[in-house]
Amino acid sequence: MNRISALILDWAGTTVDFGSFAPTQIFVEAFRQAFDIEITLEEARVPMGLGKWQHIEALGKLPAVDSRWQAKFGRAMTAADIDAIYAAFMPLQIAKVVDFSAPIAGVVDTIAALRAKGLKIGSCSGYPRPVMEKLVPAAAAQGYAPDHWVATDDLAAGGRPGPWMALQNVITLGIDDVAHCVKVDDAAPGISEGLHAGMWSVGLAVSGNEFGATWEEYQAMSKAEIATRRERAAGKLYAAGAHYVVDTLADLPEVIADINARLAKGERP
């Protein structure tokens, strides 16, 4: 049938952890613990969506972070430095990720409704497997359990922005056409992942990394601030190539209905 048959969902900022705070705070702590270097939450968010080693590498190349690093050590960050920060990051992230495992509002009901229509639920993450092995059961205990998940270090080919994690979901779930899949993510590398895999890519402008607020902060925000942040986040996701941008996963059923109408007319991603 020429319609959407599977979703490939990101984790932090998409299905769990409103605002994607678990990884950002841990990057700040890991830089401080390993080398006594301060980075801001805003800096920590910039490369979000990449595998965590690659994320640390990208942080080291940010001009402001590189400047601080050069001032302290008289040289650029090396692969050995990245390894040391990653070594600090991993136990911190494993210890903390369960605290950020609650499904985002609307996720559990939306997934149930889409499953009732026959859709399969795949997922992938920038988290490495040891972190996912803590996160997945914690989220399941609170009502969110996808049919499959892939960690950023599972595949020899690598992670985002490449297509491999998304395509591994296609293989495992037995989906016969990548154009019948929707990749949903709150960060640019995940949008690129979906495009590279030949899928429809949908960005989430409010629940994730680009909006960058906790649920409580979001609830207390003025309409003007929400609009400003939403516009900024949506702009980044559209610039990455998103076919659609909505606020949260709860808005996805309307998008899927629109994509199904386009597929029926013979359109492809």
From Swiss-Prot:
Transmembrane segments annotated in the record for this chain: none
Presence of the UniProt keyword Hydrolase in the record: yes
A Gene Ontology biological process term: organic phosphonate catabolic process
Pfam family, one: Hydrolase
Keyword Hydrolase among UniProt keywords: yes
Keyword vocabulary terms for this entry: Hydrolase, Magnesium, Metal-binding, Schiff base
InterPro entries cross-referenced by the UniProt entry: HAD-like_hydrolase_sf (IPR050155), HAD-like_sf (IPR036412), HAD-SF_hydro_IA (IPR006439), HAD_sf (IPR023214), PGP-like_dom2 (IPR023198), Phosphonoacetald_hydro (IPR006323)
Catalysed reactions, as listed in the record: phosphonoacetaldehyde + H2O = acetaldehyde + phosphate + H(+)
Cofactor binding notes: Binds 1 Mg(2+) ion per subunit.
EC numbers, comma separated: 3.11.1.1
Matches recorded under PANTHER family: PHOSPHOGLYCOLATE PHOSPHATASE, PHOSPHONOACETALDEHYDE HYDROLASE
Subunit structure: Homodimer.
Family: Belongs to the HAD-like hydrolase superfamily. PhnX family.
Designated name of the protein: Phosphonoacetaldehyde hydrolase
Natural source organism: Klebsiella pneumoniae subsp. pneumoniae (strain ATCC 700721 / MGH 78578)
Lineage: Bacteria, Pseudomonadati, Pseudomonadota, Gammaproteobacteria, Enterobacterales
